[in-house]
């Protein structure tokens, strides 16, 4: 049996790119128009609702319990000097991932602050792989915020709008993202090896899992949580014995990733 490969003509490729650009421009215009219509007070009110609205008592208790752990740890460890950077990195990170699990766009605000602080901590600890990953995270925060807001604004005409619309990967998507994970891991590993890193392919593990996790999160895919779990477990090993706050943060991340997988799986079934 002869299988004929389908060739994409330059005209078809240009048409596809043009359609994507038009969709992006339309969605961006809708987001800007919605923001202009709301005004500063309206945006502040919307942010307040996103942060505090529609949360059950169980969700409030979960948020308060996990987000209080960095403060409990800081003020009960018996050390005279407080690690304020570690404390706020841990707190903003925990709040961020809980908001992600709940499908709240405000997670990106906490994510931006967390990325800035974590960048400093990683640089001071000479974890240069983490530094590069954190720079990528920081850049992705406004992109992710736009994508989530665009999804919300452009789905407002649906009869039954949901707080967020989760998606799941098909087998083709799995193959694509697993291949991309391997490429990033190997590529960054050789890059670190070229600058004589002592652990090139170990450092590049979180580059790959973090990178794909962020892409899937931006695209509203449930499978992001699998990559976050892998990232969290490896990061616990990476920071072991170095910074107590960051270790605790990743343990909480792991727990929240399991919760996030459960919540997003329910959202996928409702979609």
Where are these regions (language model features)?
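Short, Lys/Arg-rich, polar N-terminal cytosolic tail immediately upstream
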Residues: 2-9, 13-17, 21-52
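Short linear sequence elements within intrinsically disordered, low-complexity coil regions
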Residues: 19, 26-29, 33, 123, ...
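Polytopic alpha-helical membrane-helix bundles and their juxtamembrane interface segments
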Residues: 38-102, 138-141, 148-271
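Hydrophobic/aromatic-rich structural module bridging two neighboring secondary-structure elements via a short loop
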Residues: 105-147
């Amino acid at each position: 049996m002869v299988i004929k490969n389908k060739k994409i003509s330059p005209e078809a490729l240009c048409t596809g790119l043009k359609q994507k650009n038009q969709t992006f421009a339309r969605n961006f215009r809708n987001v800007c128009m919605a923001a202009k219509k709301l005004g500063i007070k309206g945006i502040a009110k919307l942010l307040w609702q996103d942060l505090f609205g529609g949360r059950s008592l169980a969700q409030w208790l979960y948020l308060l319990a996990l987000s209080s752990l960095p403060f409990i740890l800081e003020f009960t460890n018996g050390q005279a000097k407080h690690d304020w950077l570690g404390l706020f990195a841990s707190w903003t990170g925990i709040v961020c991932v809980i908001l992600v699990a709940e499908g709240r766009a405000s997670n990106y605000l906490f994510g931006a602050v967390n990325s800035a602080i974590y960048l400093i901590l990683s640089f001071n600890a000479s974890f240069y792989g983490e530094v590069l990953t954190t720079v990528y995270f920081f850049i992705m925060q406004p992109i992710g915020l736009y994508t989530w807001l665009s999804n919300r604004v452009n789905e407002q005409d649906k009869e039954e709008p949901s707080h967020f619309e989760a998606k799941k990967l098909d087998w083709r998507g799995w193959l694509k993202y697993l291949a991309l994970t391997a490429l990033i891991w190997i590529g960054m590993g050789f890059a670190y090896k070229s600058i004589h890193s002592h652990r090139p392919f170990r450092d590049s593990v979180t580059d790959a899992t973090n990178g794909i996790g962020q892409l899937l999160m931006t695209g509203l895919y449930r499978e992001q949580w699998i990559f976050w779990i892998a990232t969290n477990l490896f990061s616990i090993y990476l920071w072991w014995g170095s910074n107590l706050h960051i270790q605790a943060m990743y343990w909480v991340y792991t727990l929240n990733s399991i919760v996030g997988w459960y919540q997003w799986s329910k959202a996928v079934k409702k979609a």
